């Protein structure tokens, strides 16, 4: 027969806390991005980024052109904004 009592294990939940850092409390939102390590992948990524940029610029110019044809010159000034606000208050619009 063994002599002495068994050593009791400490409660494992007491050790789980550990250090709570600022980053672990509030992680950043959004997708994570890992840069490619191969030269071909880097080249493809830059080409895709340039294509996306040119398409966005082209679409914005197209939409601005269509809007200016329908409405006229697109300008926002303080005087026009105040005049529009007066018309809305008076109900002329």
Swiss-Prot record:
One family name in Pfam for this protein: DUF2462
Annotated signal peptide: none
Compositionally skewed regions (Basic residues) per UniProt: 19-31
Region Disordered, annotated ranges: 1-32
UniProt xrefs under InterPro entries: UPF0390 (IPR019034)
GO cellular component terms, semicolon-separated: nucleolus; nucleus
Family recorded in the similarity comment: Belongs to the UPF0390 family.
Protein's name in the database: UPF0390 protein C24B10.18
The organism of origin for this protein: Schizosaccharomyces pombe (strain 972 / ATCC 24843) (Fission yeast)
